[in-house]
């Protein structure tokens, strides 16, 4: 127990030493909760992803948050089946899902948690569709760093597949993803092949996160099969730059600055950190009309692609099948996506409003941390615990 006048305390458990968006939002919430005056103990969830930040790219501040604090709750950034029971402390799980409904096992595990927090209304609805009690789930959007990601940042120097500098192309379309079925990278490249020609002054930049040589081999096998089925090759379209380069966090603003547009053809998103970073950087946006995108995008700030629900197909990806079996996700309309690309390449995609201004007004990290603090304070009060 502690005196009521002491500052709030919280234990956070989540992966924070890696390169994933999950690691990023664990770090940002920790950073901004601390700035709100909350004393933190940070415990790493080391098994979230194999790829970690190099030692010299890690902020040593996070490594200092190991001392115990007199917390009454543990906030765990992970999937529900990865939550570790916290004894007498309140158990809070911040998680997200990209298809409907969430797995039945998640709902069963979630019933043992004191609170589930998700970033978007779409994730909340997916939990409710699975039968989760509505009074045990709250929504707290993630944030965007509009100071670090902004117009005017010097672009990274990148070269296209033929050696021409990326900066020489008038239209530079970026996609950042880990190639898995939900991200629909094969569909994205297929749409590029059908929408563009070598005469277009445009390039597609695909920043890949490949965890192994086998993953790379499988991706390019699937791309080769797609080209064979389509009857059209990469050589018959505007150039595509695939890069698996490991960018330090300090380099990421320059990567966005190297692009003019950001494009996703994802089948479902819990948030899509790269899309929000691209919006903060001032890029023009093309996104499917579904899930998390509808939290911070609309027709005024982006080209939105119509999408239809379909059964989630995770063929050949056992780990994804375990999550998405029995769920539905979205199939973006590739013809509409091709038309959106043509609007971008032909210069007919001027947005009516600024996505960056929208993020700066409503979706910054200080705002996200303040919302989360309020949710946690309410939970402690409901259970008669000091925060």
Can you describe what each PLM-predicted range is?
Residues 212-246, 250:
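Nucleotide-activated donor-binding/catalytic signature segment of Leloir-type glycosyltransferases, i.e.
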Residues 267:
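Aromatic "clamp/platform" in nucleotide-sugar-dependent glycosyltransferases that forms part
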Residues 275, 284-287, 301-305:
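Short hydrophobic beta-strand element within catalytic cores of glycosyltransferases
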